[in-house]
Amino acid sequence: MKFQMIAAVLLIAFCLCVVVTARMELQDVEDMKNGSFQKRRTCIDTIPKSRCTAFQCKNSMKYRLSFCRKTCGTC
């Protein structure tokens, strides 16, 4: 009985994660169609070497979507 409760809770948590992720992706697609995506999420291709830090190079993808290129291309 305890195992079934744990399995049910895990299944519900997984379903909620899937739903939230899907809604975020749909919102991004709508924003792209409306043209507001680029306004809200402006990306730079490279930054000057003088402003490049190890942290920026390690975390060079600015956003999770593939529309943005690496921000530390010159490091």
Curated annotation (Swiss-Prot):
Q: Where are the transmembrane segments?
A: none
Sorted alphabetically, the keyword list is:
Cleavage on pair of basic residues, Disulfide bond, Ion channel impairing toxin, Nematocyst, Neurotoxin, Potassium channel impairing toxin, Secreted, Signal, Toxin, Voltage-gated potassium channel impairing toxin
The record ties this protein, via PROSITE patterns, to: SHKT
Top-rank taxon, per record: Eukaryota
Compartments annotated for it: namely: Secreted; Nematocyst
One cellular component term from this protein's GO annotations in UniProt? nematocyst
Which stretches of the sequence are propeptide?
A: 23-40
Site feature Important residue for binding Kv1.3/KCNA3, where: I47, K49, R51, S60, M61, Y63, F67
Boundaries of every ShKT domain copy: 43-75
| S-S pairs | C43-C75, C52-C68, C57-C72
A GO molecular function annotation here is: toxin activity
Q: What is its main location?
A: secreted
Positions marked as site (Key residue for binding both Kv1.2/KCNA2 and Kv1.3/KCNA3 (occludes the channel pore like a cork in a bottle)): K62
Q: Which residues form the signal peptide?
A: 1-22
Functional description taken from the UniProt entry: Inhibits voltage-gated potassium channels (Kv) with higher potency for Kv1.1/KCNA1 and Kv1.3/KCNA3.
The family this protein is said to belong to: Belongs to the sea anemone type 1 potassium channel toxin family. Type 1a subfamily.
Task: Mention any additional remark.
Answer: In PubMed:21339955, this protein is called kappa-TLTX-Hh1a. The TATX abbreviation is given to this protein since the abbreviation TLTX was already given to a spider family.
State the name under which the record lists this protein: Kappa-thalatoxin-Cad2a
- In its UniProt entry, the species of origin is given as Cryptodendrum adhaesivum
